[in-house]
Amino acid sequence: MEEKPAGRRVVLVAVPAQGHISPIMQLAKTLHLKGFSITIAQTKFNYFSPSDDFTDFQFVTIPESLPESDFEDLGPIEFLHKLNKECQVSFKDCLGQLLLQQGNEIACVVYDEFMYFAEAAAKEFKLPNVIFSTTSATAFVCRSAFDKLYANSILTPLKEPKGQQNELVPEFHPLRCKDFPVSHWASLESMMELYRNTVDKRTASSVIINTASCLESSSLSRLQQQLQIPVYPIGPLHLVASASTSLLEENKSCIEWLNKQKKNSVIFVSLGSLALMEINEVIETALGLDSSKQQFLWVIRPGSVRGSEWIENLPKEFSKIISGRGYIVKWAPQKEVLSHPAVGGFWSHCGWNSTLESIGEGVPMICKPFSSDQMVNARYLECVWKIGIQVEGDLDRGAVERAVRRLMVEEEGEGMRKRAISLKEQLRASVISGGSSHNSLEEFVHYMRTL
């Protein structure tokens, strides 16, 4: 099929959450570097101010009338249900206006899998549409199978006593029932309804996934067979086109602090943009970190401690504990931190972006997942890639100390570090010329130019 001239426009639709905005903006920059013009369609909930990385991009707002309080009041799952209903008509109007302005220049619509309202608008205007998955291929496969597994009573332990949740799920080794991507912010029924919409490829012509074959070859093969449309694993995108995409202000003073620390001596603690902790969990974590005798850099996001704006309601002993070995910031430049030679481990919620960024720098992990696909990622880090230690159950100082010392001091951690460096080399090889992700990206770009 003949390629059309470069410079055609791609419309990308982003989910208003940090973990989704970062990869879709990296994808946008990647496509822009390949010669495509870029339009980002976003809602008022994104709060994303274009940086110098995106001066050539067009940003348009999808009109909607949801109260701004819905983003926090409803929880992520119910909010996404409501947002998709609200934007279904308004995005058609928005896309119609873009077509009037751009004419035949628009090649396709690429939408985050959780913004599935975009598919109907693309279909109405006879535009090709592409699903973009910001989670792992394994998590995508789990979501696809969720309905069937639940109907066959295989996942019923999710509603049963915790002991039964340790049962392995047939054909999904090493995942247990409790590792399946369940949200703690919504009912099982509401979450399953969302998954039905996200995994329904409808009229999608292809799927892009921010992953690499060296990490998930079997899950990618399974997904390709299941979807029967092209699946393009083109990640990790942060290694292809790094971009400034943080919704929160990054405190770079922590880099100066890291510069004073010894190689591999610091455990970096950051639990993402959504997770919440109880005050007692914060105290237990601090005591465990202190008892481990390791230096630590800790991100405590404003609003992440229940009942507190930041850390002002924590006991006085907290500041005393921290002042000895630690450094606290409200938000950190994560990729820069993980690439710093002083960082020897990452205590993480195991969101997919954080997982890829940590592997991409050869940093082993302590895994404390909170919800959704984080549980899948944590299980794979520990049992498949063998570069992670999962902390399960309630947080207490003893568990924190043991996990940190296993990773940072003991021989077990050194083995993980060697495996992490090996995976880092494989990941970086995948995105350069001749690598699997590079080749997949070239195939996708060729496909886009034939539309």
Curated annotation (Swiss-Prot):
CDD domains from the UniProt entry: GT1_Gtf-like
Origin superkingdom: Eukaryota
Signal sequence range: none
Lineage of origin: Eukaryota, Viridiplantae, Streptophyta, Embryophyta, Tracheophyta
Parts of the chain that traverse the membrane: none
Keywords: Glycosyltransferase, Transferase
Residues in coiled coil: none
UniProt-recorded name of the protein: UDP-glycosyltransferase 76E11
A Pfam family it matches: UDPGT
